[in-house]
């Protein structure tokens, strides 16, 4: 790896001011050479490393105090390289200092009991200001150059700082010696602090948030030292002074200026005057608020240093003021030239960074300053020779700055030393963390933190454990206000914080995205920037990989393996998770414990753990856009999320795949296409037809998943909004898919999904769209016929079919259970219809008058012949009507376990329907006969099977025709039946019951089994007539068979025996007809009684209703007449009253007339 090795490279980096803009005069002179080179880990001092580590591990929100928007501060030159030049997963080993040396620095920013409290700090500040006003009343902000008269010249930090300013190009020998001496001095100071605090060093792990008991802070030590030094001579002061004197002598021996220092000084004279003028002008323009920006601790330290300055240091400061001012101006010019080439957008943030770093670096400064001041007070002559050297240069440079800049320079020099021999570049961890923090923080955020945490101390939880997962993948580019000096400069060199964390880049934001505050954007934390811009970023130590989102590639350390689970380390020290696309903010904000199963479940939704970006400068990715369009009007996307899971689980791959690009892009694109086609389908767009042609059944399955997953009201609304042509096409495509045998597995999955739906009720189904209801019923029943229905079947019937309340056979559609049957099959199987469904497989077909179905003689439940043979429900059983030990083929009913003999069943089927069959159907029935009696053990069954085989072979070979074959098989069946004695005593021969869907009523076939008091007399009469007709046909068939036998001329027994057999047959027939006649007579008597009872009941009901109706009419007439009477009476009364009034008036008029006549007569 290539790195800067000499001063030439450094000069090359500092001489990049090609535009020649004037440098910024208000920057500190030491900003351009702030510890630019550093040694390796083994060469660094434990104190410096520990101090840097303390600030990298603990950044308190107290750093945000005293923030002012118009203050200007600058970052170090390590920020002048591009962030993208370094690999994402790299973390330098030089930024991992020893833990042993970091504890004391970490504790320095103590707990509630330290001297950094607000009240004590304000009190000390007021005391310092009062003392300062008494000692130096002439000092003002308008004369910053006069401050050099009161600056202490005996500071070791100032002396070291002047060397870094004056000679940036060290020799190998001088650099090494200086690093050693400075390390010793700092280490001694740290040991003194640790001796007073009496604390025990212990390692702090990254996850630990609670510090150990806090020692006294540096501010408290500074005051204590000041107070103790005022006492008369004591042994402790003598010992301390001797130790400091030895340190000063070592610094004096090693602090030899290089030859290049003179050349730099000559160069600095060129821009010295201009720099001084600019500095003065910028100081005059500072407002009263700028004074408030000075950190309180830094102000206190400045006052303490001013009050303890002796006459010797003042004289030396005046003597070297002019000579070192030009050197300081030259350093400022070089710094401004390099720093201001960066972007102006981050200038304001970097200024904030300067203020906060000065405040945080303060605690190490006061105690060393006061120690040196006391030494100068006691033994100024002895140390005069050591002070006169290079320390005056730094003192004069510090004199030209504001108090905050002065303390910053002293603090930087006390911590950051150049130790290496010009090989590596090292930037303080505190500066780097500060720059990174402030580059991501907004101004309003800083003000909020100032308000919320105004009373907090420096002690707080460590943030080092958050650095791994809090790095943001996207740079913030936020314009801030620029000062009047920098407004005219062009933005040439972009300065930005370097992101070296192990988090995945651009995981949730698209390329070019600007907003990092949106959901799912990780927050950037402070990153360690310790590499130069010449570092080789394409080395073999880093590999190209793909993020889980498949958005873009990134470089990372091979140790960050993709073989780990995604949620393995998500709970370490409550770190911010890497993937934040699934409401991570709420989880991390509430500190709720995260379930890892949720990670896998949500990440598997898009395949291979991919999370789609939400926005790309106003343009939504197709999958996200479709999801937005599919959302409900009330803003809910729950249904879309449920369906997204169902879609994604079938195409998801392992998130640990070594090639995440392929799985993520392919599955994501397929998922996006499915969602887009579904959206187009619902919106009525024509593009869904193109998607159907391209996707085929996949598109139909996608829409079906939406239908099955969404709630019923939502899907009903969407069906109402769909065009009619889309609905028709959808039904047709679903029907084609159901007819495709390759989709049986998928159809079964759809049926299981519907079976698990508990929110579908009969009320919702009746209110749903007709097409939606037909699709649901077709999918659940597995019958595509429901997709071709017209309006002949009502929606209520379809809803009942879906709820298993009605038979799904379109030819049956009886209410379930049939005849309120409570057998073990009807009561256990939902939606089972005993009239048309198989007892074994629960399926139905349109076959009738066939041997492919067998029925029970008692309960009339049916079963497929193939199912009965397969499940051994058709087997050999004991013949109850024959001799003991005889067997026959029987069907043992699954519902009632009653055996029904098969020979009589086959005989009835052939006698009644054989003449109506076609050739193919006749051959099929013969095959079923062969199947039924294939395992028969009785003679009749065997003979019938052999006859069926011979007849089937003859038909297939065209030896005989269909009519002749039918006559032969019928004659053979009749002959077998008549030659068996057991059959002659059969009490009853019945015809083949038809399937229930071909009967007029479910109770029609069971009427003859019921009591004579049945409620269906018409059916009983019809049954009796049908039985008689059947026996007449049977008789004719038997006669024909006998005649055929006689015509064959086969050898027979004597004619007498034949006659006897005919007589026996006639007697049997007579007995049979007599029995049936008796049955018919009994049925007729029963019907007569029923008719009489019905008539009586009807007459009684008629009379009751007529009487009730007559009474009501009479009452109604009476009420009307009464009302008429009352009306007439009221009219009569009114007439009588009117008459009386008229008579009274007439009498009055007559009286008046008489009086008038009398008066006229007089």
Curated annotation (Swiss-Prot):
A zinc finger (PHD-type) spans 835-899. Residues 1-19, 61-77, 90-99, 118-134, 148-157, 225-235, 263-300, 336-346, 441-457 have a biased composition (Basic and acidic residues). Disruption phenotype: No visible phenotype under normal growth conditions, but the double mutants tta1 and tta2 exhibit a rootless phenotype and seedling lethality. No visible phenotype under normal growth conditions, but the double mutants obe3-2 and obe4-2 exhibit broad growth defects and developmental arrest of seedlings. It holds the Pfam family Oberon_cc. GO terms for biological process: cell fate specification; embryonic meristem initiation; embryonic pattern specification. GO terms for molecular function: zinc ion binding. It comes from the Eukaryota. Residues 135-146, 163-182 have a biased composition (Polar residues). Residues 203-213 have a biased composition (Acidic residues). The keyword Zinc-finger applies. CDD domains: PHD_OBE1_like (cd15612). Keywords: Coiled coil, Metal-binding, Nucleus, Transcription, Transcription regulation, Zinc, Zinc-finger. It is found in: Nucleus. GO terms for cellular component: nucleus. Residues 1-235, 251-307, 321-346, 441-485 are annotated as: Disordered. Residues 1065-1161 form a coiled coil. Probable transcription factor that functions redundantly with OBE3 in specification of the hypophysis and establishment of the embryonic root. Involved in the activation of ARF5/MP-dependent gene expression during embryonic root meristem initiation. Involved in shoot meristem homeostasis. Self-interacts. Interacts with OBE1 and OBE2. Interacts with OBE3. This is Protein OBERON 4. It comes from Arabidopsis thaliana (Mouse-ear cress). The lineage of its organism: Eukaryota, Viridiplantae, Streptophyta, Embryophyta, Tracheophyta. The gene is OBE4.
């Amino acid at each position: 790896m290539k790195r800067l090795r000499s001063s030439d490279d450094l000069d090359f980096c500092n001489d990049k001011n090609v535009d020649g803009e004037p440098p910024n005069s208000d920057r500190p002179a030491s900003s351009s050479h702030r510890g630019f080179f550093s040694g390796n880990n083994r060469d660094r001092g434990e104190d410096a490393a520990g101090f840097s580590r303390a600030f990298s591990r603990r950044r308190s929100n107290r750093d945000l105090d005293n923030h002012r928007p118009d203050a200007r501060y600058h970052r170090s030159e390590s920020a002048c390289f591009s962030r993208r030049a370094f690999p994402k997963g790299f973390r330098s080993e030089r930024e991992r200092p020893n833990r042993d040396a970091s504890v004391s620095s970490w504790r320095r920013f103590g707990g509630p009991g330290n001297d950094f409290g607000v009240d004590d700090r304000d009190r000390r500040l007021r005391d310092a200001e009062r003392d300062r006003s008494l000692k130096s009343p002439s000092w003002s902000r308008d004369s910053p150059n006069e401050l050099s008269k009161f600056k202490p010249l005996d500071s070791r930090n100032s002396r070291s700082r002047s060397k870094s300013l004056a000679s940036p190009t060290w020799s190998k020998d001088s650099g090494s010696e200086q690093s050693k001496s400075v390390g010793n001095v700092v280490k001694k100071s740290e040991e003194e602090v640790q001796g007073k605090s009496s604390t025990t060093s212990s390692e702090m792990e990254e996850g630990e948030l609670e510090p150990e008991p806090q020692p006294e802070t540096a501010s408290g030590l500074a005051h204590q030292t000041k107070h103790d030094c005022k006492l008369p001579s004591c042994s402790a002061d003598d010992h301390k002074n001797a130790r400091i004197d030895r340190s000063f002598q070592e610094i004096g021996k090693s602090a030899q200026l290089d030859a290049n220092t003179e050349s730099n000084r000559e160069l600095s004279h060129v821009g010295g005057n201009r720099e001084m003028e600019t500095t003065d002008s910028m100081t005059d323009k500072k407002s009263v608020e700028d004074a408030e920006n000075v950190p309180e601790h830094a102000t206190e330290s400045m006052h303490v240093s001013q009050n303890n300055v002796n006459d010797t240091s003042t004289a030396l400061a005046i003597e070297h003021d002019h000579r070192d001012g030009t050197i300081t101006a030259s350093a400022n010019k070089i710094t401004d030239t390099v720093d201001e080439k960066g972007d102006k957008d981050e200038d304001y943030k970097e200024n904030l960074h300067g203020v906060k770093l000065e405040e945080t670096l303060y605690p190490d400064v006061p105690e060393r300053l006061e120690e040196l001041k006391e030494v100068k007070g006691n033994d100024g002559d002895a140390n005069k020779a050591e002070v006169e050297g290079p320390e005056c240069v730094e003192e004069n440079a510090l004199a030209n700055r504001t108090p905050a800049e002065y303390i910053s320079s002293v603090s930087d020099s006390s911590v950051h030393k150049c130790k290496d021999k010009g090989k590596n570049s090292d930037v303080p961890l505190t500066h780097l963390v500060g720059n990174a923090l402030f580059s991501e923080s907004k101004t309003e955020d800083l003000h909020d933190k100032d308000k919320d945490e105004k009373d907090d101390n420096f002690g707080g939880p460590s943030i080092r454990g958050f650095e791994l997962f809090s790095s943001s993948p996207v740079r913030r580019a936020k314009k801030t206000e620029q000062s009047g000096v920098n407004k005219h400069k062009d933005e040439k060199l972009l300065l930005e914080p370097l992101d070296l964390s192990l988090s995945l880049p651009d995981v949730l934001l698209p390329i070019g995205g600007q907003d990092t505050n949106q959901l799912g954007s990780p927050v950037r934390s402070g990153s360690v920037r310790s590499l130069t811009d010449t570092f080789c970023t394409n080395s073999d130590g880093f590999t190209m990989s793909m993020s889980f989102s498949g958005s873009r590639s990134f470089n990372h350390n091979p140790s960050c393996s993709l073989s780990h689970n995604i949620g393995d380390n998500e709970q370490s020290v409550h770190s911010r998770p890497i993937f934040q696309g699934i409401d991570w903010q709420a989880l991390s904000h509430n500190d709720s414990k995260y379930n890892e199963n949720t990670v896998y479940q949500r990440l598997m939704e898009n395949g291979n753990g991919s999370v789609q970006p939400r926005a790309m400068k106003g343009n939504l990715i197709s999958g996200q856009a479709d999801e937005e369009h599919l959302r409900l009007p009330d803003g809910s996307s729950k249904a879309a999320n449920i369906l997204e899971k169902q879609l994604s689980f079938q195409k998801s791959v392992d998130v640990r795949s070594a090639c995440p690009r392929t799985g993520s892009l392919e599955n994501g694109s397929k998922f996006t296409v499915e969602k887009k086609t579904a959206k187009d389908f619902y919106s009525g767009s024509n593009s869904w037809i193109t998607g159907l042609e391209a996707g085929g059944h996949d598109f139909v399955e996608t829409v079906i998943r939406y239908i099955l997953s969404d709630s019923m009201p939502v899907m009903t609304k969407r069906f109402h909004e769909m065009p009619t042509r889309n609905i028709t096409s959808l039904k047709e495509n679903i029907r084609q898919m159901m007819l495709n045998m390759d989709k049986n597995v998928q159809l079964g999955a759809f049926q299981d999904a519907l079976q698990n739906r508990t929110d579908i009720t009969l009320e919702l189904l009746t209110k749903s769209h007709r097409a939606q209801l037909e699709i649901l019923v077709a999918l659940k029943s597995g019958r595509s016929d429901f997709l071709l229905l017209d309006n002949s079947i009502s929606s209520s019937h379809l809803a009942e079919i879906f709820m298993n309340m009605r038979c799904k056979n379109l030819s049956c559609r009886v209410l379930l259970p049939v005849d309120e049957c409570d057998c073990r099959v009807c009561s256990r199987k939902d939606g089972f219809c005993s009239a048309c469904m198989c007892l074994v497989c629960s399926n139905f077909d349109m076959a009738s008058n066939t041997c492919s179905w067998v029925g029970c003689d008692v309960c009339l439940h049916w079963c497929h012949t193939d199912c009965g043979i397969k499940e051994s429900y058709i087997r050999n059983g004991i013949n109850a009507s024959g001799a003991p030990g005889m067997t026959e083929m029987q069907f043992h009913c699954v519902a009632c376990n009653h055996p029904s003999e098969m020979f009589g069943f086959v005989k009835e089927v052939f006698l009644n329907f054989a003449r109506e069959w076609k050739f193919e159907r006749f051959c099929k029935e013969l095959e079923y006969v062969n199947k039924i009696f294939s395992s028969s053990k009785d003679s009749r069954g065997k003979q019938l099977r052999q006859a069926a085989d011979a007849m089937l072979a003859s038909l297939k070979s065209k030896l005989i025709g269909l009519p002749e074959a039918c006559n032969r098989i019928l004659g053979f069946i009749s002959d077998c039946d008549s030659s068996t004695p057991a059959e002659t005593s059969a009490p009853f021969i019945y015809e083949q019951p038809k399937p229930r869907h071909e009967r007029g009523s479910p109770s029609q076939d069971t009427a003859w089994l019921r009591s004579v008091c049945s409620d269906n007399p018409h059916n009983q009469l019809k049954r009796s007539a049908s039985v008689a007709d059947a026996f007449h046909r049977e008789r004719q068939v038997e006669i024909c068979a006998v005649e055929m036998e006689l015509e064959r001329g086969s050898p027979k027994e004597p004619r007498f025996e034949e006659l006897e057999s005919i007589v026996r047959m006639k007697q049997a027939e007579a007995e049979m007809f007599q029995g049936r006649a008796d049955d018919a007579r009994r049925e007729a008597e029963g019907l007569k009684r029923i008719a009489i009872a019905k008539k009586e009941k009807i007459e009684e009901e008629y009379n009751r209703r007529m009487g009730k109706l007559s009474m009501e009419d009479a009452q109604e007439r009476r009420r009307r007449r009464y009302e008429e009477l009352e009306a007439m009476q009221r009219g009569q009364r009114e007439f009588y009253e009117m008459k009386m009034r008229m008579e009274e008036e007439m009498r009055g008029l007559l009286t008046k007339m008489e009086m008038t006549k009398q008066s006229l007569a007089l």
